[in-house]
Amino acid sequence: MDNFARFVDLVVNDVTYLMDRSLNELAQIHNIETEMESAQEWAAKSPQYRREQEGALRSLERYAPGRITLGRLTVNLLKLLTAETKTPFMVPEIVGKLAAMLDYNLGALAGPKCRNLKVRNPEKYKFDPRVLLSDIVQVFLNLSDEKNFVRAVAEDGRNYKKGLFEGTVEILRRRMITTENEIEKLLAFVCKVEALETILEEEGLGQAPEEFSGTPYFNARFVIPFLTDVVGTLDRDRGQGHDQVAFAFGPEGPV
């Protein structure tokens, strides 16, 4: 890697660490505040346990805002960098962990576990989930035309889920976080990921179409009609299954 690619690698590592740490601390704050909500149940805890939890909360109140702020700033830096240049993010040493980090954090902010980030006073901790979600989505959009990135997301079997992106779209629309053009671009990106994921599965089964032999990416002759079918599927499925996801930005989410 050249010097700038090394810098990009450090930025991705910093975002990964700071987001994981800050969201984990928000979840801890949520858990302690939830315990304290019932005065009767809290009073039933042992004095030592209450002291320990209250001390942990004071410590989190002291240190979490700084880490959350750093996390937000590094995500914003990532958004700005990916808007200006793509190539350094596409090197094999970076693109896979970048895709996994983005998928994971999208899940944390817009997936079922987002309710764990709901705290009594998010402003106190410098936590703005709308801004974080908007910036992470923008990174996806900035890289959405890069074949290496599409492939990296398609290969992220642990974190990538089509339903998560569909749920994110519902949040973006409901909260008017981004424009309809950007939402359509995000849905088109999901179509590309789904198409390539299917192709990769066929390759794994030895059933890849002949025109894909010897190439790691998709061929326009196959993908254009395939994406048309996928878009139709997305349109049909868009209203299904969302009631099973506790979206952030709803009554049970962090805002």
PLM-predicted stretches and their roles:
Residues 1-214, 218, 222, 246:
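Extended alpha-helical scaffold domains
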Residues 213-253:
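Small Cys/His zinc-coordinating "RING-like" fingers
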